[in-house]
């Protein structure tokens, strides 16, 4: 592809510059190969302009940079633009050229992964070759690629979308994080619909205020969705009204789900141990669903996913039937096993205050004994949530064990102390493996254990090193060791 064939560069790349052949695109100078277009982006920690010379040395034939970015004597065309992140996303979309016919995106603090996964499953039930992209990876009829980035950078995203299209995928659901939206990673995606789940405290190390955080998420509606496109909004969150207003002002076709929903109205929920009986109204029809998932938050996620599926071609009756067959996303209230007495042990990704509150509230109805929770907070991230999560854990669980969870460059004991300050009666065990084994060893009949924070993750980040670690594997090992000591 020639540089001038990327529509945005028609005028900027005139003459000989426009004839330059582009063989790839990247914003990482280390990934540059001969013929690449390099995007010199300003980041929080570094300015890509510093690496422009290195990119050229590695083979870059053109550079995208901001209008206020000076790159002297580059030796290749430098295209100065108002919003280089937006331009990078559009260029990546044009370079790779293909994406599934039907694309939807979901934003919100919690539930994005589950909604994207559930939407894929409902589409698949209805006969559409479908995929989902997000925190747990890329899942389609032909692949299960695990990674840990909620919204991939635009080059990687469009490479994956092109591959999925070549594999025959026609429908894809993706997560839209506030970082991804703010950094324009989705700007080249042609969306058919969008969704909002909820808003709580998260990423306060990146966004200055909750209003700024909400504003980043609302870019999905006011910048990315075409006018008239459906916006599925969970109606029962404290920020639902703001999301509805933003989507309405953006010209979206707003459809709400939940107890206050006007599209899918939740009428009744009856909790059982590992499933829930749900009654909803859609138009004039009443549907009874046996949802094979625990927790009110999973009901909300399922309804948002059903809404997305319905506005993209799935009949209501088929969508409701599909809900009875849903499987939880990896690491989302994931039942690992049980003790010899039948006390269940779960792993959950909850690493934010609202998510921790949701999961602990969800297991309470079917817990006849104690709720036991093991959790920690990440280093180099929002410090303000640590005492908040400590208070939530001590209020909603009967036994709290505070441990380490990706301390990164911080002193682990300091992180734990900030949690412990508000976690009345909690036990502190820094070693996460020891904390899990201790929790499993103390389980009694009727108890429920939740190990929160990592979910699907397979590592513990200490300093700059990621050490192999799986909550799922450690809980399974602890249960196995217990069963050896106490056979049924």
Curated annotation (Swiss-Prot):
One of its GO terms (molecular function) is UDP-N-acetylmuramoylalanyl-D-glutamate-2,6-diaminopimelate ligase activity. The keyword Mitochondrion does not apply. ATP binds at residues 108-114. Its cofactor is Mg(2+). Meso-2,6-diaminopimelate binds at residues 381, 405-408, 453, 457. UDP-N-acetyl-alpha-D-muramoyl-L-alanyl-D-glutamate binds at residues 29, 150-151, 177, 183, 185. GO terms for cellular component: cytoplasm. The keyword Transit peptide does not apply. Pathway: Cell wall biogenesis; peptidoglycan biosynthesis. A motif (Meso-diaminopimelate recognition motif) lies at residues 405-408. Its main location: cytoplasm. Its EC number is 6.3.2.13. InterPro entries: Mur-like_cat_sf, Mur_ligase_C, Mur_ligase_C_dom_sf, Mur_ligase_cen, Mur_ligase_N, MurE/MurF_N, UDP-N-AcMur-Glu-dNH2Pim_ligase. Catalyzes the addition of meso-diaminopimelic acid to the nucleotide precursor UDP-N-acetylmuramoyl-L-alanyl-D-glutamate (UMAG) in the biosynthesis of bacterial cell-wall peptidoglycan. This is UDP-N-acetylmuramoyl-L-alanyl-D-glutamate--2,6-diaminopimelate ligase. It comes from Brucella suis biovar 1 (strain 1330).
């Amino acid at each position: 592809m020639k540089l001038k064939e990327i529509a945005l560069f028609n005028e900027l790349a005139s003459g000989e510059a426009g004839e330059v052949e582009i063989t790839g695109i990247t914003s990482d100078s280390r990934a540059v190969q001969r013929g690449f277009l390099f995007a010199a982006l300003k980041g929080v920690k570094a300015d890509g302009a510093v690496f422009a010379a290195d990119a050229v040395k590695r083979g870059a034939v053109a550079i995208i940079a901001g209008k206020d970015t000076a790159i002297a004597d580059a030796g290749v065309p430098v295209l100065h633009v108002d919003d280089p992140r937006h331009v990078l996303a559009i260029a990546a979309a044009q370079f790779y050229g293909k994406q599934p016919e039907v694309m939807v995106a979901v934003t919100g603090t919690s539930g994005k992964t589950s909604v994207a996964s559930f939407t894929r499953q409902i589409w698949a039930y209805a006969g559409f070759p479908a995929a989902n992209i997000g925190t747990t990876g890329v899942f389609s009829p032909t692949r299960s690629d695990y990674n840990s980035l909620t919204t991939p950078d635009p080059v990687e995203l469009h490479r994956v979308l092109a591959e999925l299209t070549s594999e025959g995928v026609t429908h894809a659901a993706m997560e839209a994080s506030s970082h991804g939206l703010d950094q324009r990673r989705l700007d080249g995606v042609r969306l058919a619909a969008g969704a909002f789940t909820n808003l709580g405290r998260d990423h306060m190390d990146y966004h200055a205020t909750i209003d700024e955080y909400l504003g980043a998420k609302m870019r999905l509606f006011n910048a990315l969705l075409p006018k008239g496109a459906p916006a599925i909004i969970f109606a029962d969150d404290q920020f639902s009204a703001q999301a509805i207003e933003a989507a309405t002002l953006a010209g979206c076709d707003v459809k709400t789900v939940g107890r206050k929903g006007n599209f899918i109205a939740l009428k009744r929920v009856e909790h059982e141990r590992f499933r829930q009986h749900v009654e909803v109204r859609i138009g004039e029809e009443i549907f009874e669903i046996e949802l094979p998932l625990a927790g009110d938050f999973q009901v909300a996620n399922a309804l948002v996913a059903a809404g997305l599926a319905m506005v993209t071609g799935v009949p209501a009756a088929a969508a409701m039937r599909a809900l009875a067959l849903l499987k939880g996303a990896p690491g989302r209230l994931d039942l690992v096993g049980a003790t010899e007495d039948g006390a269940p042990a779960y792993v959950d990704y909850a690493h934010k205050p609202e998510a921790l509150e949701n999961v602990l509230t969800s297991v309470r109805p079917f817990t006849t004994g104690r709720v036991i929770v093991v959790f920690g907070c990440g280093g180099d991230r929002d410090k303000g949530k640590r005492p908040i999560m400590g208070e939530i854990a001590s209020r909603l669980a009967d036994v709290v064990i505070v441990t380490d969870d990706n301390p990164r460059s911080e002193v682990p004991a300091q992180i734990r102390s900030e949690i412990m300050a508000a976690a009345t009666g909690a036990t502190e065990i820094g070693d996460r493996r020891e904390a899990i084994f201790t929790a499993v060893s103390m389980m009694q009949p009727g108890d429920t254990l939740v190990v929160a924070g990592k979910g699907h993750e397979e590592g513990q980040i200490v300093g700059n090193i990621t050490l192999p670690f799986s909550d799922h594997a450690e809980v399974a090992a602890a249960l196995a060791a217990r069963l050896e000591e106490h056979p049924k």
